[in-house]
Amino acid sequence: MTYIRKTHPLMKIVNNAFIDLPAPSNISSWWNFGSLLGICLILQILTGLFLAMHYASDTTTAFSSVTHICRDVNYGWIIRYMHANGASMFFICLFMHVGRGLYYGSYTFLETWNIGVILLFTVMATAFVGYVLPWGQMSFWGATVITNLLSAIPYIGTNLVEWIWGGFSVDKATLTRFFAFHFILPFIITALAMIHLLFLHDTGSNNPTGIPSDADKIPFHPYYTIKDIMGVLLLIFFLMLLVLFAPDLLGDPDNYTPANPLNTPPHIKPEWYFLFAYAILRSIPNKLGGVLALVLSILVLILMPLLHTSKQRSMMFRPFSQCLFWALVADLLTLTWIGGQPVEYPFVVIGQLASILYFLIILVLMPIISTIENNLLKW
């Protein structure tokens, strides 16, 4: 008897992607984050849909509609906080997923990696426009400051900013279009994630050793479905811990004040997951230079396959590269901390040093150390 999952046109696709998929027998828990990102995306789309049913994208009613969701809608508070903190969990999983790719050399799957970088940009754009929607002080000023960065583009900058704003300042038109973007982008992310998976299943998964595992494959189900369920339970546990015990831990108190164009908050800063890029932006005194550094801080990931000089794919057997990798992680944590600090001594200097170190490790030190390790192998 042939199973329906192997013959039905739709079931066959699901079967080949999640059930009978040949997977390496030695992939660790670092390979759980792909499925966790899928769960996060589904969770965000569902909670977002229910929030959109009650949200009003107008400058006069946006803030009060969010308040109304929290106070009057049945379980509105939990939906709102699951959505807000779900974004934080999404980015934690994203950073882990990208970090895993860097550590184990998964960037050698060019198509998968490049689609992944595009996905990262799209998720960041979605999170940014979403942060504007509650129309609190930090929403308004964050939108003003970040969109204003585009004015650094020569010749067309000012026109471009006014075009995005839909006027001469962040106003009703801006909020309405940001809501439209925030609604449509997750579906674009879903489509991109499917393409990401399509390219991954074309080559098969990488594994911690970086050695081809064609001779040693096991079916995805039940081995990795069980393993993924464990990850999902942990994700939901930590998410609900945040939502039920400290829902505002990662938010900004200023966002509980309605947006006021006449009153600037003392420290304008984005959500925690953008702080590393924000610190890089602030560390350069020139506006255009800062914007370029900001974009390059993420775009540099595209260059990873070109910067790979090692004869080994993974860092598993490369202790010097491992030291550099963890130095990079420490540097990113430092940048995240600096991004949330005021622009004054010593934070400015620390930010500048951390920014230089970030690009130095990725663009210079990693290729050099990899070459040294290649030569050490000859001894």
Swiss-Prot record:
GO terms for cellular component: mitochondrial inner membrane; respiratory chain complex III. Component of the ubiquinol-cytochrome c reductase complex (complex III or cytochrome b-c1 complex) that is part of the mitochondrial respiratory chain. The b-c1 complex mediates electron transfer from ubiquinol to cytochrome c. Contributes to the generation of a proton gradient across the mitochondrial membrane that is then used for ATP synthesis. Keywords: Electron transport, Heme, Iron, Membrane, Metal-binding, Mitochondrion, Mitochondrion inner membrane, Respiratory chain, Transmembrane, Transmembrane helix, Transport, Ubiquinone. GO terms for biological process: mitochondrial electron transport, ubiquinol to cytochrome c. The gene is MT-CYB. The lineage of its organism: Eukaryota, Metazoa, Chordata, Craniata, Vertebrata. PANTHER family: CYTOCHROME B (PTHR19271:SF16). The keyword Iron applies. Its main location: mitochondrion. Heme b b562 binds at H83, H182. This is Cytochrome b. GO terms for molecular function: metal ion binding; ubiquinol-cytochrome-c reductase activity. The chain crosses the membrane at residues 33-53, 77-98, 113-133, 178-198, 226-246, 288-308, 320-340, 347-367. CDD domains: cytochrome_b_C, Cytochrome_b_N. Its cofactor is heme b. Binds 2 heme b groups non-covalently. Pfam families: Cytochrom_B_C, Cytochrome_B. The cytochrome bc1 complex contains 11 subunits: 3 respiratory subunits (MT-CYB, CYC1 and UQCRFS1), 2 core proteins (UQCRC1 and UQCRC2) and 6 low-molecular weight proteins (UQCRH/QCR6, UQCRB/QCR7, UQCRQ/QCR8, UQCR10/QCR9, UQCR11/QCR10 and a cleavage product of UQCRFS1). This cytochrome bc1 complex then forms a dimer. Heme 1 (or BL or b562) is low-potential and absorbs at about 562 nm, and heme 2 (or BH or b566) is high-potential and absorbs at about 566 nm. It is a multi-pass membrane protein. It is found in: Mitochondrion inner membrane. The keyword Mitochondrion applies. A ubiquinone binds at H201. Belongs to the cytochrome b family. Heme b b566 binds at H97, H196.
